[in-house]
Amino acid sequence: MRIEYDDVELRAEILNFIMRKGRWGEHYFPIDTMANWLGQVVKNNGKNIRKKVKDLAKEGFLILHKVNTTVSLNPRLKREIEEYIQRNLKDR
């Protein structure tokens, strides 16, 4: 079942997905794989997911690796990331 998220909820869902995988610092995850997995749950398409990943990287929540093909969470902002997820991700 696909759910339609607004921009803030989608960003929180991306952060939550990467956090559940335990990808902090140099332990990174491929963006394409993440877009495919989230595409099964999120009604928004993969391009929107990739756009939100770039936005989160500009804000410092995410670190891009390997010529922007992989991503991990910024360990320096761990508390802010956890608060952002709790504040913006609705229980579904």
Predicted ranges, named:
Residues M1-G25:
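Short alpha-helical segments that sit at the start of domains
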Residues A57-V67:
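A short, conserved structural fragment
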Residues T69-N74:
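Minor-groove-contacting beta-hairpin "wing" of winged helix-turn-helix DNA-binding domains
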Residues W24-G39:
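Short acidic, hydrophobic short linear motifs in intrinsically disordered regions
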Residues V41-K58:
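Short amphipathic alpha-helical interaction segments
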Residues L77-R92:
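Short, amphipathic alpha-helical interaction segments positioned at domain boundaries
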